[in-house]
Amino acid sequence: MVIIKLNANKNMPVLAVEKPQEIHKEELSDHHQSNGFTSLDLEMIELENFVLHCPLPEENLAG
């Protein structure tokens, strides 16, 4: 994929083409796919871990 910026900088030509940088998380996902996990699996596991570590609200907050 290529990102094209129009008039991003006055010193540059009208079209400036940039290659997006891959993020570290994608590299980790590719590494874990050999273990049978997809990137969606890893994101769901991360979300589940986040929810499990969230503090629960105290009961009867309204009254």
UniProtKB/Swiss-Prot annotation:
It comes from the Bacteria. Involved in DNA transformation; controls virE2 polymerization and prevents virE2 binding to DNA. Keywords: Crown gall tumor, Plasmid, Virulence. It comes from Agrobacterium fabrum (strain C58 / ATCC 33970) (Agrobacterium tumefaciens (strain C58)). The gene is virE1. This is Protein virE1. It holds the Pfam family VirE1. One of its GO terms (biological process) is protein folding. The Ti plasmid contains at least six transcriptional units, designated vir loci, which are essential for efficient crown-gall tumorigenesis. Forms heterodimers with virE2 that prevent virE2 anarchic homopolymerization and binding to DNA.
